[in-house]
Amino acid sequence: MFEKTNRMNLLFDFYQELLTTKQKAYVSFYYLDDYSLGEIAEEFEVSRQAIYDNIKRTEESLEKYEEKLGMLKKYQQREKLFSELEAQLTKKNFLDEQVKDTLEQLKNID
């Protein structure tokens, strides 16, 4: 569950502008503020089932956006390369061929 929550939070960060106002609100309450479905339903005066259905549809939409746009995947690739670069620079005090290659990979991600 923790892994799914983290993924949804990241997807929400990248794609929230593509969501409706209602979708943003429900997902924000559920994933960011850790409200229960019942608490969100009470807040918006709708059924718990309506909240559940909307959140599930929104999760599917976020996954489809990621499938098509790949912003999270690219972000994770960049982060991995930055970590590798940091490790290389820590070991060496100057730019060498290995560091140049890693920098080139960073440039080619997008």
From Swiss-Prot:
SUPFAM superfamilies referenced in this protein's UniProt entry, alphabetically: Sigma3 and sigma4 domains of RNA polymerase sigma factors (SSF88659)
InterPro entries named in the record: RNA_pol_sigma_r3/r4-like, UPF0122, UPF0122_fam_protein, WH-like_DNA-bd_sf
A matching Pfam family: UPF0122
Stated role: Might take part in the signal recognition particle (SRP) pathway. This is inferred from the conservation of its genetic proximity to ftsY/ffh. May be a regulatory protein.
Protein origin, superkingdom: Bacteria
Name the UniProt record assigns to this protein: UPF0122 protein lwe1821
Organism whose genome encodes this protein: Listeria welshimeri serovar 6b (strain ATCC 35897 / DSM 20650 / CCUG 15529 / CIP 8149 / NCTC 11857 / SLCC 5334 / V8)
UniProt record similarity statement: Belongs to the UPF0122 family.
